[in-house]
Amino acid sequence: SLSGLAGAVAAKGGIGIISTAQIGFREPDYHQNPHDANLRAVKKEIRRAKELAHGGIVGVNIMVATRHYEEYVRAAIETGADVIISGAGLPVTLPEIAAGVPVPGNGRPVKLVPIVSSLKSANVIFRYWMKKYKYLPDMVVIEGPLAGGHLGFTEEQLRDIPGMHFEEEADRKEIPVVMAGGVYTGEEAGKWISRGLSGVQMATRFVTTEECDAHPAYKQAYIDAKEEDIVLVKSPVGMPGRAIRNTFLQKAGKGAIPHGKCHGCIKTCNPADTPYCITEALIRAVEGDVENGLLFCGSNACRSERMETVGTILDEVADALK
């Protein structure tokens, strides 16, 4: 998700989220200097999304596992991001980083939102942030096993979710809890909210929108996908993920795929023994080479039947919640 989709969602009353993962791939110097290209693009995409949002809420998703994590957080806050969502690891230092960055102009203080996959990981974050920073999350995203991309869940699955209501008595701060993963329709969103959650995060449904920044061929791959085409894969970064079966995955299953210069994306990736470069694979996919790229998706990608608009989807969700 880049500024086009994030801005459109925010303009319609949702929280539009930009992914910072190798966000600078469209910059002319990306392959020569990915670090600077990514930081530049973070700022460009946030500014553009906020212009499109017309006062709506725009946030960024920054993986803890990303190299230069702190720099991306700082750049996002300096540019006026309203929300920082952070997972793929425990964002234990996020409040400290944010505290050191002045909010631009008369902007709103940035909201800090960890992604958790279990009650245990949520409690770790709560206790650590409170003890070290006297700060509690402004919201929590629970990422379930039906989500797209890298998955944080293991055996605990969704067992604890219905009882996850967080409140810190000392501060009387009630913390909204948002469900992510496997939510595709307004009716499904309503079911989670009726169970006491504050909201839902939807991603897969928005890939096949006119406003999504991905290549049309990427969107068509979702529309063409059948349930049996969606498989679990092991990412080079050491986490499981879900993707659409294609030529690339068949080749990856038979052995390492040669790659070029390291783009320095993930802390845990060792270029010397990685089976393939996840950055190169994801960029090929988002640029339209859907047979030779990695098509990350959620479990509901096979439910995509046609192109839609952001407004149509959010109207459906709003109607279901009435």
What are these regions (language model features)?
Residues G87, A180-G181:
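Short His-Asn-centered micro-motif
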Residues P34-L39, G59-N61, D82, I115-S117, ...:
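Short linear motifs at secondary-structure transitions and domain/linker junctions
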Residues A147-V178, Y184-K322:
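Conserved active-site-proximal phosphate/metal-binding subdomains
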Residues S1-E168:
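Active-site entrance/lid segments in N-terminal catalytic domains of soluble metabolic enzymes
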